[in-house]
Curated annotation (Swiss-Prot):
It holds the Pfam family Ribosomal_L35p. One of its GO terms (cellular component) is cytosolic large ribosomal subunit. One of its GO terms (biological process) is translation. It comes from Chlamydia pneumoniae. PROSITE patterns: RIBOSOMAL_L35 (PS00936). Residues 1-55 are annotated as: Disordered. This is Large ribosomal subunit protein bL35. The lineage of its organism: Bacteria, Pseudomonadati, Chlamydiota, Chlamydiia, Chlamydiales. GO terms for molecular function: structural constituent of ribosome. Residues 23-35 have a biased composition (Basic residues).
Amino acid sequence: MPKMKTNKSVSARFKLTASGQLKRTRPGKRHKLSKKSSQEKRNLSKQPLVDKGQVGMYKRMMLV
């Protein structure tokens, strides 16, 4: 049986924390930032955790 392949799009978008949770980045902070307020850009910088219901699916895709 061949090796399992990691889903590269998922592994690029999510980072695994030491406790096993997944961090994600918020969309909307790549371009057109001049229209956004400082507060909005600051809030987009925060990296929330992925919801519990989807963590298992993403971990399987990352082969963790």
